[in-house]
A protein has these predicted regions:
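Surface-facing alpha-helical segments and adjacent helix-coil boundary elements at the starts of domains
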Residues: 2-198, 203-207, 216-218, 223, ...
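Extended accessory and catalytic-adjacent subdomains in large enzymes
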Residues: 122-156, 160-374
Length: 374
């Protein structure tokens, strides 16, 4: 699988006029003495070429990086690497490569939307699966379905263990959420005779996410009102064995904390596609943006349209827990913003009216047809 990805990446780079570079090949290095720095070639001699030096300076390689490697060629897809203060390898890519990767991510959004009914049908089924007696009503399938439902409705990041274990600035996502990050309270969202749990509860996540942003996200799910109760079951099932909130039990009754790779494997298994948890955030950002743009006044002039986009991006960024810049560049399909600013959005939006593709919402159905037709 890894070799196949590399072959595809090499082909993509060549098609874009780049070559697939690596920090294992000869390159330039950076030498820091006091408050000054210089760049050396593979023979240890100073780099003197004005174009090379200009290219390197434009990369804005952080001063704190150590073991800096810089590609000798201007068309390498990977332009520089270094080790940051937390001993992590960081990468700087060619702008064309970054744009290619971004476009590829957005290009699959219509396919993701078309696959969502299949994903939802399967996780709805798995949410009802209780496993055997040893699994305490929390088999792998049910817990994965629970987390994917949360991804689908809250757009919370999946998280990773490296960020969770950062002693200075620990941040969290769904797979790394701790017991302390969830609170429960009674709710009357479901009639008494429809309840399967002892008492109907609502839930709220309170945690610090990426970029040190504090999040408060409610999980009162009108379509699946017992979802918070499933989260409560996960919390209650551990009996102090772990601080991690989510866990599942295998067929022998052994518990295992949920990891991000478990969730991504489940998503790929039920979708039949190479989707990941992040695709739910990209889909969510795109859907929210399209919904808000569709509510703008059609007759707004160019100046007002720019203001509207700024307001919209800020709103979506707040919902996703991003900065507006990251939200616009990484989570909102650029076609909606570009078409709106050009004045063609409402015509294209009207042209894609059609029947609701259940279990997708009307706006989700609209977004898919827009991406496929425009």
């Amino acid at each position: 699988m890894a070799n196949e990805k590399k072959i595809n990446a090499i082909a993509d780079a060549e098609q874009a006029g780049l070559y697939y570079s690596s920090n294992t090949e000869e390159g330039f290095t950076r030498e820091i003495k006091g408050e000054t720095h210089s760049y050396l070639d593979s023979d240890g001699k100073p780099v003197k070429g004005k174009r090379d030096l200009k290219r390197i300076e434009e990369m804005r390689i952080p001063p704190a990086w150590t073991e800096v490697w810089i590609c000798k060629e201007k068309n390498g897809h990977l332009q520089a690497t270094g080790i940051d203060a937390k001993k992590r390898t960081q990468y700087i890519y060619h702008p064309i490569w970054t744009q290619l990767r971004s476009e590829a991510k957005f290009d699959k959004m219509s396919t993701f939307g078309r696959t969502l009914p299949k994903i939802r049908e399967k996780y709805f089924e798995d949410l009802a699966y209780e496993g055997n007696k040893k699994q305490h009503d929390l088999p792998y399938e049910r817990v994965m379905a629970l987390i994917v439902r949360l991804l689908d409705t809250t757009f919370i990041r999946i998280g990773n263990e490296t960020s969770r274990d950062d002693k200075e600035k620990a941040t969290y996502g769904l797979s790394t959420m701790q017991d302390e990050h969830i609170d429960f309270e009674p709710t009357e969202i479901t009639d008494e005779h429809d309840k399967w749990y002892d008492s109907q509860v609502g839930g709220k996540f309170t945690f610090v996410g990426k970029s040190n942003k504090k999040h408060e996200i409610e999980i009162n799910d009108e379509e699946i009102p017992d979802l918070p109760a499933l989260v409560m079951m996960c919390k209650d099932a551990k009996k102090g064995k772990s601080d991690d909130l989510f866990l599942f039990f295998d067929e022998d009754g052994n518990s295992q904390d949920v990891k991000a790779y478990h969730v991504n494997e489940y998503i790929q298994e039920i979708s039949g596609e190479k989707f990941t948890a992040k695709d739910f955030r990209t889909w969510g950002g795109t859907k929210l943006a399209a919904e808000e743009i569709s509510e703008f006044k059609k007759k707004d002039d160019k100046k007002q349209r720019k203001k509207n986009i700024t307001k919209m991006v800020k709103g979506v960024a707040k919902r996703l827990g991003n900065t507006p810049a990251v939200c616009r560049g990484s989570y909102i399909h650029p076609r909606f913003i570009n078409d709106y600013l050009k004045g063609s959005f409402f015509r294209l939006w009207k042209d894609t009216l059609g029947e609701q593709m259940y279990p997708l919402s009307e706006s989700e159905s609209h977004v898919i047809r827009y991406l496929e037709n425009s």
